[in-house]
Amino acid sequence: MSRIGKKPISLPAGVEVSIKDNAISVKGPKGVLEWALPEGITVVQEGNELVVKRPSDIKQHRAMHGLSRALIANMVQGVSAGFEKKLELVGVGYRAQMQGKKLVISIGFSHPVEVEPPEGIEFEVPAVTRITVKGIDKQLVGNTAAHIRAIRKPEPYKGKGIKYENEVIRRKAGKAGGK
């Protein structure tokens, strides 16, 4: 991970970074994200670039160096451009719709499933079989999308369920006999 840690993070226009004690705060047009730096890792702002530094080459510091650089880069991208995950509903009668801020999914259960968006997450339903999860925190966007997918995972025989837009479902052959 140390090669990733060496790369400086360029700050786009409109993104401000403040480093206090052991915490970094990134503010941009879409919002503010804060994160506590691991012990020993320091961040220095040089013009419109951030440089992440480590105190020594021990394994723990090398690992935290790359991790910190990657997470700070995700914070910068989140507050400037944001993140989104797209999901597809595959199956007859499977549909999604918005009710206020809530997402309501009819996915073959006896009742519709309602999903409340966590703080900082926004749902969009561009079509009845498509869901878009948007937000500035990459981890929260991914976790929310995974939570929605876990409601009905794609099954391997017909591929019915909720899948990521670019996900390829490994299909299985059905039973050979029986006709």
UniProtKB/Swiss-Prot annotation:
Short name of any one Pfam family annotated for the protein: Ribosomal_L6
Segments traversing the membrane: none
Alphabetical UniProt keywords: Ribonucleoprotein, Ribosomal protein, RNA-binding, rRNA-binding
GO BP of this protein: cytoplasmic translation
Family annotation (InterPro entries): Ribosomal_uL6-like (IPR000702), Ribosomal_uL6-like_a/b-dom_sf (IPR036789), Ribosomal_uL6_a/b-dom (IPR020040), Ribosomal_uL6_bac-type (IPR019906), Ribosomal_uL6_CS (IPR002358)
Molecular function in Gene Ontology: rRNA binding; structural constituent of ribosome
A cellular component term, taken from the record's GO annotations: cytosolic large ribosomal subunit
Record's keyword annotation contains Ribosomal protein: yes
Family: Belongs to the universal ribosomal protein uL6 family.
Function, in words: This protein binds to the 23S rRNA, and is important in its secondary structure. It is located near the subunit interface in the base of the L7/L12 stalk, and near the tRNA binding site of the peptidyltransferase center.
NCBIfam families named in the record: L6_bact
HAMAP family the record matches: Ribosomal_uL6_B
Quaternary structure and interacting proteins, as annotated: Part of the 50S ribosomal subunit.
Protein name, entry field: Large ribosomal subunit protein uL6
The gene coding this protein: rplF
